């Protein structure tokens, strides 16, 4: 793909995402106002967090939310607290499934999930709108599909990870990730982690900062729109830095990239 094609591609992506987000926000807001006018359910007034599930242990975690803030904390046992009556929980064969049904309330809702710090087989999180905060995400396989909202992950440890960014600030403050496939959306990205194996960072719209732990890296650059700085040196298209065993392919989007 030529630079001209890349420019057209990323401007088209940015404009399309902006239009989708604007139209979706307007529709959701309008529907919420209408529903709120006619539907005065008692559940909409519940703000107190209630514990709805406890367990000694699980193998995997699967979370699917529409418009609820997600907080993941570490604890010795597994438990769930929420003030959202539309949250449903079920466990089967060690897989804990948390799903939100038909929540179009305008009131903010929270979901707090307590899990042990031990490594799970898989963590799968898909969100629509709302913030995400996690003390630790430790899993052999990590899959995040993000919507609109700020994401803050204090620590990530994963053997293989796929992250599809949404709209909003994304941050990993510490980690060890093997074979990361990261597709940024719109918003600033900060990742501080050791990246092992073969990794791909496909940037979107906004500034991306990679604070790599260790020095055993080989960096390959595919430049888009904006500046790419590797150790404060401006990179050009198809340039390679280092000859380490851990490979990181950086595909530029719209905005500055700093490694």
Language-model features, listed with the residues they occupy:
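Short linear S-[DN]-x-LW-Φ motif typified by the pepsin-like aspartic protease active-site region
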Residues: 29-122, 126, 131-137, 141, ...
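Generic intrinsically disordered, low-complexity segments enriched for polar/acidic and small residues
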Residues: 7, 15-18, 50, 238
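Short, surface-exposed interaction patches in beta-rich subdomains
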Residues: 153-156, 160-259
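Hydrophobic membrane-insertion alpha-helices, especially the h-region
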Residues: 9-28
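N-terminal Lys/Arg-rich, disordered targeting/topogenic segments
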Residues: 1-7
